[in-house]
UniProtKB/Swiss-Prot annotation:
CDD domains: LipB
Localization in the cell: Cytoplasm
Lineage: Bacteria, Pseudomonadati, Pseudomonadota, Gammaproteobacteria, Candidatus Pseudothioglobaceae
Positions marked as site (Lowers pKa of active site Cys): 130
Protein name: Octanoyltransferase
């Protein structure tokens, strides 16, 4: 599996590249993880409703093809896009979602942070505050999109939305929960390796 760090990128540019990669890959194309940090943007999933954006905003709003509802991406947040051939891996969408969520939980455990899942609410939580979101798109057994993990960012844009469709949902970030000085790139590298290890152990 290839891991590519693309640095700071506009969302639309990366979304277009994900679709192109997925549409043109064949049975021999290696799976890839793309590490990205986005410029400020609200993205709406296929289940999102207009009323989940609560106020007028100068932040761009993009209607995407991923699952889920509305969320915010911005500087200080780790994004990892998972471009996988699930048929080749021998797993379904439900299993890959579990792997992504468990990878985030395992990463946070290395910072002595106890994270958990919520029934019916995809993502990863610390107490009642969301620290990570995920949304995927599947096309002919191939997935794209992925996860976002709040590290050290301005959380105020989340006030302008119902994150993931939930009213008054609190959000949190790693820097408020640990004294670690690990950089965004170090954290992204750690999370990528945990994710790769999970996928390797679970493929059939």
């Amino acid at each position: 599996m290839r891991v590519i760090n693309l640095g700071r990128q506009d969302y639309l540019n990366i979304w277009d590249k994900m679709k192109t990669f997925t549409n043109t890959r064949d049975k021999n194309t290696k799976d890839e993880l793309w590490i990205v940090e986005h410029n400020p943007v609200f993205t709406q999933g296929v289940s999102s409703k207009p009323e989940h954006i609560l106020s007028n905003t100068d932040i761009p709003i993009v209607q995407t093809d991923r699952g889920g509802q509305v969320t915010y991406h911005g500087p200080g947040q780790v994004i990892i896009y998972c471009l996988f051939d699930l048929k080749r891996l021998g797993m379904g969408v439900k299993r890959i979602i579990e792997i992504i969520e468990n990878s985030i939980i395992d990463l946070l455990r290395t910072y002595t942070i106890k994270a958990h899942l919520k029934s019916g609410a995809p993502g990863v939580y610390i107490d009642n505050a969301k620290i990570a979101a995920l949304g995927l798109r599947i096309k002919q057994s191939r997935i794209y999109h992925g996860l976002s993990l709040n590290i050290d960012m301005d959380l105020s844009p989340f006030i302008q939305i119902n994150p993931c469709g939930y009213q008054n949902l609190k959000v949190t970030q790693l820097c408020d929960l640990t004294d670690s000085r690990d950089t965004l790139n170090i954290i992204a590298k750690k999370l990528s390796q945990i994710l790769i290890n999970y996928v390797s152990r679970n493929r059939h």
